[in-house]
């Protein structure tokens, strides 16, 4: 592609030039997958606690008194590794999830930049929404459904799943493929809004930081701070959808006719506060999650730019 036609990519710059270099979607897929795998290994304990608190419904006597009590009970019963129960199900999904997200975002954003290669905030929002939907349908919904069922099963009195793959086989055998796509509508809404908010905030902050110099290098620390801010914004923006999604994918999903019915039942039986159950552990996890992912993604793309010459 001629230099005059190359749009500016979100993560790479061409020093000394008025326009930034295109980030090839293939690079985005590789960098995104690596970033997703590393991130989930670091942040999984907070995801585990968040899921436990959301499944601890108020309609029954609460099992946990809060975040600290959930951690204490888990460590006392299963040791420190107990906080990593269900990791495999999320790890298998995190790598392709981030790969699809960043690959799609770069593909869309490379076609939506202006003549100077800039991506404005509105287009960043649209590209984020566009990246979140296929991420939800292809990877997130089936993997999150399996993860929630697996964690729920492992914390029951008599666990029936011997491992991740055994759990997948049992879920498919008992419920068919439909059993791995529970809560699809809530998941699409959640992921679409998630990525829309995050990329909107990241694009806005990057544009503000770089000002009139689109090639101004981004320090990893600055990228991490911007990522944490983007993560916090997405948490407060769509935690209710995350709660509904988790309920729709749990072992008691049969109680709800659909996504709307789930939301109405939660509101009627538990009140508005229930929609923000698990917000604190999710906030800590997501801020760290988004910061780590964007840092690793940016650095891997920089490395790939040195060894993979693609127009």
Curated annotation (Swiss-Prot):
Propeptide, chain numbering: 1-13
SUPFAM superfamilies assigned to the protein according to its UniProt record, in alphabetical order: Mitochondrial carrier
Main location: mitochondrion
Cellular location(s): Mitochondrion inner membrane; Mitochondrion membrane
Presence of keyword Repeat: yes
Keyword annotations: Antiport, Membrane, Mitochondrion, Mitochondrion inner membrane, Phosphoprotein, Repeat, Transmembrane, Transmembrane helix, Transport
Catalyzed reaction equations: (S)-malate(in) + citrate(out) = (S)-malate(out) + citrate(in); D-threo-isocitrate(in) + citrate(out) = D-threo-isocitrate(out) + citrate(in); citrate(out) + succinate(in) = citrate(in) + succinate(out); phosphoenolpyruvate(in) + citrate(out) = phosphoenolpyruvate(out) + citrate(in)
Modification after translation: Possesses a short cleavable presequence, which, however, is found to be dispensable both for targeting to mitochondria and insertion into the inner membrane. However, the presequence is required to keep SLC25A1 in a soluble state and thus in an import-competent state. Mature SLC25A1 lacking the presequence is prone to aggregation.
Sequence segments annotated as region (Disordered): 1-22
GO MF term list: antiporter activity; citrate secondary active transmembrane transporter activity
Annotated TM spans: 29-46, 86-105, 129-143, 183-202, 224-241, 278-297
GO terms under cellular component: mitochondrial inner membrane; mitochondrion
Solcar repeats: 23-111, 122-208, 218-303
Any one GO biological process: mitochondrial citrate transmembrane transport
Bias type Low complexity, positions: 1-15
Positions where Phosphoserine occurs in the chain: 156
Membrane topology: Multi-pass membrane protein
Known function: Mitochondrial electroneutral antiporter that exports citrate from the mitochondria into the cytosol in exchange for malate. Also able to mediate the exchange of citrate for isocitrate, phosphoenolpyruvate, cis-aconitate and to a lesser extent trans-aconitate, maleate and succinate. In the cytoplasm, citrate plays important roles in fatty acid and sterol synthesis, regulation of glycolysis, protein acetylation, and other physiopathological processes.
Similarity comment: family membership: Belongs to the mitochondrial carrier (TC 2.A.29) family.
PANTHER family tied to this protein: SUCCINATE/FUMARATE MITOCHONDRIAL TRANSPORTER-RELATED, TRICARBOXYLATE TRANSPORT PROTEIN, MITOCHONDRIAL
UniProt-recorded name of the protein: Tricarboxylate transport protein, mitochondrial
Species name: Bos taurus
